Amino acid sequence: IGHLRQRPVVWAVGVGGLFGYHFFYFLALRNAPAVEASLIAYLWPLLIVLFSALLPGERLRWWHVAGAVTGLAGAAVLILAGQDFAQPIQLMPGHFAAMACALLWSGYSILSRRLGDVPTDAVGGFCGLTALLALLAHLVFEDTIWPQDSWQWLAVAGLGLGPVGLAFFCWDHGVKRGHIQALGASSYAAPLLSTLVLILFGFAGLTWAVAAACLLITGGAVLASIDLLRASKR
C-alpha cells in the first residue's frame, strides 16, 4: 500500500497518461478513418525522442531523430499499404483526438522519466483508477456488448493481463531506467509485430510493404541506438 501514497502530481501524470491516451484513441477511431487516426496517434514514439531533449542529462543527437523518423516511415508504409486515397483527406474531430493521443502518451512517458523516484509498483494504482474511469466512460458513451463465448472471455482476460496490464509496468520501468531515445524509436516495432503474428497464423500475407516496414523499423531502431551500441563495445 505504501507505493500508492504518492503526490497528487504523480497521480495526475499516471492516470492522465493511461486513461487520457485510451479515451482519446477510441474517440479518434469513432470520429475519423481508422488508418488516418492510427497513423497520427503513432507520432508518439517520434515525440518521445524529440521531447527527451527537455530531460536533465539527455542530449538529442541527429541519429536519434533520424532513427525515429525512419521508424515512423516504416509504420506508415505498413499502415497505408493498399489504401485508396482518391478522396482528399479532410480534417475531422477524430484527427485532433488522435493528435491528443500522441501528445498524451509521449508526455506521460517523458514525465515518468522525470519522476524516476516513483516506484513502478505505483502503476497498479494508476491502472485501477484508469479502469474505473474507463468503466464510467463506457457507460456514458458506449453500448455494452458482452463476450459471446469462452474464447472471447479469454481474449478479454488476455488483453487485461498483457497489453493493458503487464505492458504498463514494463513501459514504466523502461522509460525510467532505459535508453529513452532508442526505446522511442524501437516502439515502431509494435504494428510490425502485430502484422507478423497475423501472417504467422494465416490471417495476412507477406507483402512488399511488410518487408519494407521490417527494414525501415529495424534500421531506425538500430540508428537511434548508435550511442548505446558504441558504449557496449567499449
Predicted regions and their residues:
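Specific transmembrane alpha-helical segments of multi-pass solute transporters/efflux pumps
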Residues: 1-36, 40-41, 77, 160-178
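Juxtamembrane helix-entry segments on the extracytoplasmic side of multipass membrane proteins
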Residues: 3-8, 80-102, 140-158, 205-215
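Cytoplasmic-side transmembrane-helix entry/capping segments in multi-pass membrane proteins
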Residues: 6-15, 60-72, 95, 117-128, ...
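Hydrophobic/small/kink-forming positions within alpha-helical transmembrane segments
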Residues: 15-19, 23, 45-50, 76, ...
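Helix-helix packing/entry segments at the starts of transmembrane helices
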Residues: 22, 37-43, 111-132, 161-200
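Hydrophobic/aromatic residues within transmembrane alpha-helices
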Residues: 28, 54-60, 115, 122, ...
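Transmembrane alpha-helical segments that form core, pore/gating elements
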Residues: 48-50, 54, 86-142, 156, ...
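Hydrophobic transmembrane alpha-helices of multi-pass small-molecule transport proteins
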Residues: 51, 60-82, 127, 131-134, ...
